[in-house]
Amino acid sequence: MDAKITKTRIAHMLSYDWLKIVGLAVALMLFWNLIFTMTATRVRPSQQFTVFNHQANRPLSEDFFNDLGDALQGDTFSYEVIETTTNDLTEAGEYVSILLDSRLKIHEADVMFIPKLVDPSTAYEENGETKYKANYLQSFLRSNRSYLYDLDPEKEGGYFYELKAYLNGYYGNYKNAETIDEEKIEKDFRDRAKKNKDKRFKTEEQLALGAQKEIERVQKYRDALIKLEGFVESGIVAFEEVEAQSMEYQFKGKFALNLCPNKDTMDELKKYASYSEKVVGEDGKETLRKTAKDMCVMFFDTKGTEESFEYESLLYVVHLIETCRAA
C-alpha cells in the first residue's frame, strides 16, 4: 500500500466539509472568547481587600480565614469591597520577594501582619556578642518604603492626616459634627461614577441607591477613625516609630500600628495572627509558644486604589481590634 504523503492527498483531506466545519467552530469559539475577555467587568483594586502575612509569622489560622469571611459577609467593609484575598508569605519560601513584588505592582495589597522582632538576617558580631542592625519592621520599610503609608496623624500626606482632611470635607469637623453634607457626597459620587463609567450605576435608580451607600461609607470611616483614636488613647494599640536607611535615604515615621503592645488587652489576637516564641521551662527545656505580643500591621499604599477607598484598611483593622480586645 502506498502511504506516501503528497500535496494532492493533503489538498483532498483539507477539502472535506467536516474539517471545514470544525475549523469554523474553533474560530468562532476563539472569537467569542476574545470578545468576552475584552468586555468582561474586572474587579478593580478598590473592590478587593488583600491581607499579607509576613514570613516570620506562623501560617494564617483557620480562625483568621473564618473571621475574614465573616467580615466580608457582614458589615465590616463598605459596599465597594466585594472579595477578599490573602498572601501568606510563610508558605513562599525563597520566593517571598518575587511574590510580594508581583502583588504590589498590580496593586493587590492592603495590610500586612508583621512582628516587631529582631531580623536574624541583620545579625553581626561585636566583642563576641551577637547584635542586630534591624528588626522586621525596619527591614521591610527599607525595602518597601514607596509602598507604605506613614500613619502619623499629624504628618501631612500620611494615611490618617489625609483621612481626617477627607472627612472634614463632608463634616466640617469630623470629631463633633452632628450633620454630614449628604448633597456634596452624592455629587462627588455621581461625578466619580460618570468619570469611571461604572457599570454598576447606569440608571437613576442605581445611582440613587449608590449615593445612599456612599453616604454610609463615609460614615463608616468616621466611626472607625474615632474608635481607633480611642483605642490609641487608652493604650490598647499604639503607633510604632520605625526608622530605616536605604542607600543614601533615611526614613523615619510611624509606619506601623502595634496591635498587641499589651498581652493583657489584645492576647486574643494570637488566634488570628501570631508567631512562635521560645520559652524555657522549669526543666530547662526550650519549647515554642504561640504569641501575638508586638504584632503590628502596616498599611500599603499601592497607588492603584482609587482615592479614599484605601480607608477600607482602617475598617478591617478596627474590626479586628474589636474582635480581639479583652472585655
Question: Where are the regions that the model predicts?
Answer:
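Early extracytoplasmic/lumenal segment of secretory-pathway proteins
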Residues: 42-120
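Composition-driven low-complexity repeats that form or flank extended alpha-helical/coiled-coil segments
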Residues: 238-247, 251-255, 259-260
